[in-house]
Amino acid sequence: MLNQNNQELFKPSKEFSRNARIKNLCEYYDLCDEAKEDFEGFWKRQAFEKIEWFSPFSRVLNEDKAPFYKWFEGGTLNVSYQCLDRHMKTRRNKAALIFEGEMGDYEVYTYRRLLHETCKAANLLKKFGVKKGDRVVIYMPMIPETAIVMLACARIGAIHSVVFGGFSPEALRDRIIDAGAKLVVTADGAFRRGKPYMLKPAVDKALSEGCESVEKVLIVIRNNEPIEYIKGRDYVYNELVKNESYKCEPEIMDSEDLLFLLYTSGSTGKPKGVMHASAGYILWAQMTMEWVFDIKDYDNYWCSADVGWITGHTYVVYGPLACGATTIMHEGTPTYPNSGRWWRMIEEYQISKFYTSPTAIRMLHADAPNEPRKYDLSTLEVLGTVGEPINPSAWKWFYDEIGGTKSPIVDTWWQTETGGHMITPLPGATPLKPGCATLPLPGIFAEVIDEEGNKKDEGEDGLLCITKPWPSMIRGIWGNDERYIESYFSQAKKDGKAVYFSGDGAFYDKNGYITITGRTDDVVNVAGHRIGTAEIESAIAKHPSVAESAVVSILDTIKGESLFAFVVLSPASSCDLGGAIETLKELNDILRVEIGPIAKIEKILYTPGLPKTRSGKIMRRILRTIARGEEIKQDISTLEDSKVVETIVKLAKAEFE
């Protein structure tokens, strides 16, 4: 069976489908039809079946103040109870979390132990004055205490905001200030590529100015490197938590009470604090674990994502634990101490469901394509990819070499803002197409449309929108309702009503499958990490030679995308093309400090100007076309100075061809 691009469709094996939760496309379409015919009834049934409510909800969906939607009003619950306490009768001695550190250390937390450690951490947080509604920033490595503190916050009703440990002190400071955090939880450091790296000094620098809301800092001792302690502010978690009681009653939370904030890059420079509510988020985390990974009680499940990103929230911590699965957490990189580490872990821990990024797949494929053959990977039943579209050649290697042609690949599309998967194959039902997200999940009304809501025809590029609300959707941007509407509900309408625009472009193929074409806004995706171009350009502007810049993405065989900077030099600058390499190094030094090592420019081109509209907006789509060496098809007649495009094209050809 071939699609319009002559790519083979890979059908699920009959054996797998026979035992899957959703066994075929007929069952998939039955669920879709149920959601279409009785939208609220569909979600009501799911919510009552999946969640252990303290008190039942009285209203499924409140659209009175759309797009500020509310779900399951009147209901009360606690997310940590959903993930831990409810499993005590049947799974108390089952492994909940297995941790492997980079230095070879290993630890197993049963559901009973994880509950006890969560309660002890929750009691410690309360002793430090943290109460319902307070914000706790977590700046931690991939160690069990990170998940424990997240669950402890959920238990007492505090709102956690995890900040990726690779972010700079300045980026951390911005997030602490915006959230108004009362407490910061960090570690002395951790290990990466066999060496200790530090986190506490970054916290010290972040708190050195403008973080008046922070009262205390809790430090988990991980790598035992020397750190500075500030008396009256800094306390060692490990010493204090062991004295706490292992009993802590869960706070009764309303369905719409916030569970966490997670900051994501925006096109205006300032990161956006995405808000997620308790009931809708945990419901969809659990449902997608069951549907997309076909999670079963016997599964050892591994998602390789860092908890600093939404994937780590939903598919390392909350989703697996809500389902009563065993989740694997690892510290380190895919290629240390060698390129066989991940395959050795799959063999050793008998992983059955494995979820990772296309960047990691491409890296391992390039580094040691035959290494997986040294290991027994036969326990794998489902493979998954996340963070960016996967190119067909990487997909095929993953399918052939890692899955042995028997494990379906769920190529998942979703976002920080969606809370969980939105468009993805179902492993027992959907014929797979390499590099294609395929079909929306039941209950998710994802469509490729134009600005007026007209559905695009096969092969036509359009806007990827979600035309109905869903339980795990973003509830707003922390402290900025106007930006929430502008960012997500101002680009497209359907039937006269504003709908959620993802920021991605997409098209339908002849099978009705959706293929994601990438960002349409000023956000780049490097190795699965979204970074706002405005944030990068603001940092670059601190270089004395830079008058103006525009940053776009170019294709990268390992990262998927990397950064290309068009730089206009200041009149006083003495820099020329001969100094480009040195300037590139200097710019990357600035970016490392301002944002972190994930923001690294790979190529730089000096230009006399940038293509702008008459209103002054930089046309990054044109620059992206030039940077990628593609033919310009955009209309440049409306530009303030169309000749600048011709100049940039000539400079790019001279520099890079």
From Swiss-Prot:
Transmembrane segments: none annotated. CoA binds at residues 192-195, 311, 592. Keywords: Acetylation, ATP-binding, Ligase, Magnesium, Metal-binding, Nucleotide-binding. SUPFAM superfamilies: Acetyl-CoA synthetase-like (SSF56801). Mg(2+) binds at residues 543, 546. It holds the Pfam family AMP-binding_C. Acetylated. Deacetylation by the SIR2-homolog deacetylase activates the enzyme. Signal peptide: none annotated. It is an enzyme of class 6 (ligase). PROSITE patterns: AMP_BINDING (PS00455). Belongs to the ATP-dependent AMP-binding enzyme family. This is Acetyl-coenzyme A synthetase.
